[in-house]
Amino acid sequence: MAEKNASAVDGAIRVSGMQFSYDVQDPIFFDFNLDLPAGSRCLLVGANGSGKTTLLKILAGKHMVGGKNVVQVLDRSAFHDTELVCSGDLSYLGGSWSKTAGSAGDIPLQGDFSAEHMIFGVEGIDPFRREKLIDLLDINLQWRMHKVSDGQRRRVQICMGLLHPFKVLLLDEVTVDLDVVARMDLLEFFKEECEQRGATIVYATHIFDGLETWASHLAYINGGELKLSAKLDEIKDLKTSPNLLSVVEAWLRSETKVEKKTKKKPVVTSPFMSSRQMAYYR
């Protein structure tokens, strides 16, 4: 039986009463709570601007939020315990990877160097896992990074991000540049990682093809509020809809209608009203 490295931790991700805002802006999250068990594959869904990327970055330890117990990954503080990321136990792959070098900031991955130079430059890697990922992502080690397409560059970056056997993986729209075959093969690899090693994955995406049988959990965010968090097979709407896309589309359309109703009517300024803007005419 395969060893489940992360199974010793019942709650792989735990967020308790989280509040967060950027600078002096209104809070994005207020009293936000989320619990995910080890081995789960959670889809994170919501409209653009709902807070998905911010939540993933908080879970990845990129933003400090409250005390050490507010955001816990593998029973450790996501922000304060830097060993989580340094050890590879916690890994984050975001959309910015298509143009930047991981934690190296805004350094473009378009220099004249090979895919082999990048992939084999990561030390302490299991050769079998490395070869498996190279084959899985159909990477040509002779690719020159300044000449490849965005999709090919994305494959190299995903490979580098998965070389260390993670325990918690946070994915933010990482498959947008991949073709159908590469995307489905990668999802199958992720599923094996969860089932065989007990790893936990949170995946934010707007592409829902094939995810009905892939995900184990779903979390739906609207305006920084967790509207739903449940096992996929316990969501009532899925039992009466043809697919996941239809369900999420209905949720997003519903929240759009509510937003339109709550928008304030524009203030109309009349020449007969006392107004600073009309002082010119008086």
Curated annotation (Swiss-Prot):
Cellular component, GO annotation: cytoplasm
Tissue expression pattern: Expressed in root elongating zone and root meristem, as well as in elongating etiolated hypocotyls.
Coiled-coil annotated spans: none
Domain named ABC transporter: residues: 13-248
InterPro entries: AAA+_ATPase, ABC_transporter-like_ATP-bd, P-loop_NTPase
GO molecular function: ATP binding; ATP hydrolysis activity
Induction conditions: By sucrose.
Domain of life assignment: Eukaryota
Assigned keywords, A-Z: ATP-binding, Cytoplasm, Nucleotide-binding, Transport
Family according to the record: Belongs to the ABC transporter superfamily. ABCI family.
Protein name in the entry: ABC transporter I family member 21
Source organism of the structure: Arabidopsis thaliana (Mouse-ear cress)
Gene: ABCI21
